[in-house]
Every structure is written in structure tokens, then in C-alpha cells.
Amino acid sequence: MTGSRSKRNKTIVVTEEEARELSPRILTPRDISGGLSFADTLVNGDLLDVLGLLPDSFADLVIADPPYNMSKKFGAAAFSAMPDGQYEDYLRSWFRQVCTKLKPDGSLYLCGDWRSSSSLQKVMEEELTVLNRITWQREKGRGAASNWKNGMEDIWFGVKDPGHYYFDLEAVKLKRRVLAPYRDNGSPKDWEDTPDGPFRLTCPSNFWDDVSVPFWSMPENTDHPAQKPEKLMAKLILASCPAGGVVFEPFAGSGSACVAAKKLGRHFIGVEIDRDYCLVAAKRLRMADSDKRIQGYDGVHFKERNSP
């Protein structure tokens, strides 16, 4: 899992020695067949094999980032694009059971791109009440000679009970620089004068343009081809999981939701089929023992894109 890299490259890799050290932190379906205690847990296995071993109604929040409906390699595995109806059947093969893991007041976020978004909405509406669709702007992405560059992804937000679910608006307000700092009788009007300049706290919308996709110079970067930013996961977790609650990440990949949950004082259960990605996630979780920082979040408010 290592190779020749620039000294400035901060991508997280796992050495053979680290793999031996980290392996005891990763469970298998056999390890949890007698029941799972809710110490923070990372399980290496096929989601369909693991779901039946997990109790119902344990998660305050589910963040599901399944393979999008495109042909793509994920480590040793690969996913192939398929007709929409077949992709929806694939989603149903695990989504219904994942929803049973939510508490009665739980929330679920389901990630996708423009190709899969309509299928995600359709399948989610069969099990949950859809409250919103978040669209977030990616900085990465290839241009196209005869089409618009694909620079957006979607996250569908659903709940079990639309009359009773957790949502903490104050925890996810965005700290934005004020370009026209008007004053009222000499005092700031709806903004705060700080040593760094004028800022205003704004309510988050369902369009996010303040998230940076991890790249080689960021300390959270990994070799996973579809890694989600910790900042993005932190927004979902702070909004929809109370302190001390449980976050379930059924397609953990390199563990962004699990890591963000740990840094923010939540518990987590992550399931990932690829052993190498489990090791990367385990290393990130170990790093989070001593470093709770999340880029773009100061511990109180979220900052604009590319803020430290």
C-alpha cells in the first residue's frame, strides 16, 4: 500500500508493520456473530453478511455512500454500470435492511451523483420520508469536450418520522466573510467584527460550496477513489446525530464518516468489504486519538472553502 511519493504528499498509506498493528482493530462477521457491543467498531465484510448480525434500531444516523451507477474500480473490487431498474434493485437489496438499523427518530443520508440521483430518491421514498436533497460542489473533476463538466454530487436526506427527528441547526451554521459590512448607528448590522475581519453566521442551505475534495497535500487524503471529505461528514453528523449518539456507515471505504464521528464525540459502526481500505480507516481512526482537527471547522462553526 506504499509507493514512491513526494515528501510533500500527505496521502495516508499503511505500511506492512502498521497493517500488523492495526489488524486487531478490525473485526470480521465471525467476530460479531455472538452479538455486537457498541464500542466503536470497524467490520471487514460484505454488507449483506453483516447486516443480519447487527441489532435493529441502534443508529441515530446512517450515512450511506454506495457505489454510484457507473463502472469503477474500488481496490480489488469493481462495480459495473447497469440499467436504472437493475440499479434500483441493487439498492433495495440492502437499503430496506439498513433502514431497520435506524432508531425511530433516526435520520439517513444517501450519497450519489446525477446519474443515480433519481434512483436514490425513488428507493428512499419506499422506506423513509424524504426531507431534502443536498447538492455539494466538487472542486475535482475532469472537463468534457462536448458536455458540461460534472462538478456536483447529491445527498438525499430522509427520516423515519418527519414529526420527530434530531436536527441541530446551530451546530452547522457557516461563518462567511461579509463583503459589504453595513453599520447601524456605528454598530455592525447582522455581522461580527473580528480580528480577521467582518463575518456573519448564516443558516446552511441545501447547496454546499464550502467543501474541498481531499487531495494529495491534505492530511486526510487517501488512495480511495471516492473518498468523502471529513468536513462534509462533520456537517451531516453535527446536524443529525446528538453528542454520544451512534453513526452507522454501511459503505465505510476509507472511513471518513467513522473518523469524523470519533473526532466529534459520537460513536460509530463502519462496514467495508475491502481489507486494505479497512486498514486505512483503522489508521485514520488511530490518528484521531490525538488529532481531532477537521479542516474547515474550528470546533464551533464551519468556515468557507479552503479555510484551514
Tell where the protein language model's regions lie, with residue ranges:
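Core catalytic lobe of class I
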Residues: 1-22, 26-280
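Long, positively charged, glycine-interspersed low-complexity recognition regions
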Residues: 279, 287, 300, 305-308
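Conserved SAM/SAH-binding loop
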Residues: 44-49, 298-305
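Short, conserved SAM-binding/catalytic segment
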Residues: 28-37, 282-298
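Short, flexible loop/turn segments with low-complexity composition
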Residues: 169-173, 292-302
